[in-house]
Amino acid sequence: MKKSLVLIISIITFLSFSCVNVNSKKMTIDTKKDKNLYEKKISVFPMENVEISNDVIKIFPQKENTTYTISGYFNGQIVVMKKNTIIKLNNAFIENTSSRAAIKCEEKTEISAAKDSVNYVVSSGRGFFTNAALQSERDLVIGGSGTLFIRGYKCHGVEAEDVKIKGSGDIYIEGTKAGSAVTCDSFTVEEGKTFNCYLLNSKNGIKADEEMKIASGNFYIFNNDVALKTDDESENKIQEQCLLALAIS
């Protein structure tokens, strides 16, 4: 059953409009289908202030706002250690089969999908870790004009303090029924963004503990127990009213 609405979100004192489509059908990210199409060796440019071992890549630029372009296949963890670093994925397949985050950001980081590129960030494997495929201890910006698939087989797709989505690309995020596609303190989309964001097969599509401000973008929510969730009880009631007012088609 397909449900569509223009969702009115009022978190704290902020009112905004965004197009959100809710669908009960299942749509999943196939992380095996295209893996062999990627270069077997990871490429990071520039190589300054980059340390590569067997299963860990550490990126620690001297200056903020430094951009690193990553291409190819890597099984392990990329650790971003400097504030305001920009990671541009250009046909990259980053996975961690040791059940840890594929990309871990110790400071505020931007993850951007390059134009016309298709990229994967995947966390899987056995173990007791319940983290996310893309994880930040601080703020996280996700954007670009390419395609980005994020899948967390262990718990969440994306986890950060504050999450901001921007750009004009296609972003697919999948967690588990024990976690969220996106979990954070605050979730923000500014005006004028044209991206498509697909939130798939999780307990919560977006779980924002403190606030949610969505002013633009297109959201497609497939097979999540709760589409949008905040810990503010009054705002949960607003969201419930919006969902009850869906036009069923």
Summary of predicted features, one role per range:
Residues 4-21:
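Sec-dependent N-terminal signal peptides of Gram-positive bacterial secreted proteins and lipoproteins
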Residues 19-249:
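A composition-driven surface/loop motif
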